[in-house]
Amino acid sequence: MPWSSRGALLRDLVLGVLGTAAFLLDLGTDLWAAVQYALGGRYLWAALVLALLGLASVALQLFSWLWLRADPAGLHGSQPPRRCLALLHLLQLGYLYRCVQELRQGLLVWQQEEPSEFDLAYADFLALDISMLRLFETFLETAPQLTLVLAIMLQSGRAEYYQWVGICTSFLGISWALLDYHRALRTCLPSRPLLGLGSSVIYFLWNLLLLWPRVLAVALFSALFPSYVALHFLGLWLVLLLWVWLQGTDFMPDPSSEWLYQVTVATILYFSWFNVAEGRTRGRAIIHFAFLLSDSILLVATWVTHSSWLPSGIPLQLWLPVGCGCFFLGLALRLVYYHWLHPSCCWKPDPDQVDGARSLLSPEGYQLPQNRRMTHLAQNFFPKAKDEAALPVKG
């Protein structure tokens, strides 16, 4: 195997280890914070932290279990019996099991001098599912936890060391999950245009900078009006859920479980953009961007008209320039990315190759694993991929 290929396999293995470590670190900091809140008599805060952890974990296990049930028979040849897998998911260990399975397969293909096409495709299959689950966990648990911690700090006027650790790990975890998910989507495209270092940095930064003002706006509103933030989230979430439902998603293995995906996507859209339907994304992205921006402006107007100071005595005017600066810088970097670094800007499809023709069959002629869930999403995110995949094979 060429050194470049072995280097790519090693890079994927290291990224898998780092992703799993980041998940465990984030989980540990959340549990640490919950214990500290309980010891300090802040039982409501501790209960909120644990509730967010529990809800996100249950959703993650449901996704994982439904996907495992729908995977082709015999695909996961060395996995435990179905009853053991069901028990693992019931104990909230299904996601960690998948992480271990991915790392084991990644180590296997890296150690082989000439890994088979099946082993390589199976490693990609596992990594793509992990990437999707990590994204769901990020917006179901990490982003709400980050908002909660910021609201607690702003309301109390104190910042404990474990809270700073939680904030740092949350921001990095969210941006990492978005970057890893976007990188995974690119591997599903016909020409497999991987993210370079420059485009990775730009993509990482614009997601971080645009997410920060949104989280800050909701956190400040929560600190000033803790009794109304749940109503605000529920009202906005229902509108976003209706929008997702009207787009007719078909991501899950069967229609009866599609609701889980739709409610999760509606939660993601509360914080960030996520494309769920076929067709050109620019119009939908602009509508969502304007909707979220209008909501954040209304939150800011609510602060200004009701109070100029937080309960902790911190003037709100100190936070507004920070949020605005991050927003405009993130918006500029987003425009740079989509104008010069997006795959559609330098699309170089192979006209002799149809999407899937390369990856569905091995040289020996047997079927290779293909993660149709992520391939479908990649075609939604990058419409040109579907257009090029539909080209007839020449020759």
Curated annotation (Swiss-Prot):
Assigned keywords, A-Z: Apoptosis, Cell membrane, Cytoplasm, Membrane, Phosphoprotein, Transmembrane, Transmembrane helix
Originating gene: XKR8
Residues on Extracellular side: 34-47, 180-200, 245-258, 306-312
Subcellular localization: Cell membrane; Cytoplasm, Perinuclear region
Main localization, broad class: membrane
Domain of life: Eukaryota
Protein name in the entry: XK-related protein 8
Family indicated by similarity: Belongs to the XK family.
One Pfam family here: XK-related
Site, Cleavage: residue positions: 355-356
Residues with PTM Phosphothreonine: 375
GO cellular component, one term: perinuclear region of cytoplasm
Regulation of this protein's activity per its record: Activated upon caspase cleavage to generate the XK-related protein 8, processed form. Does not act prior the onset of apoptosis.
Post-translational events: Undergoes proteolytic processing by caspase-3 (CASP3), leading to its activation.
The keyword Chloroplast belongs to this UniProt entry's keyword annotation: no
UniProt cross-references to InterPro entries, sorted A to Z: XK-rel (IPR018629), XK-related_scramblase (IPR050895)
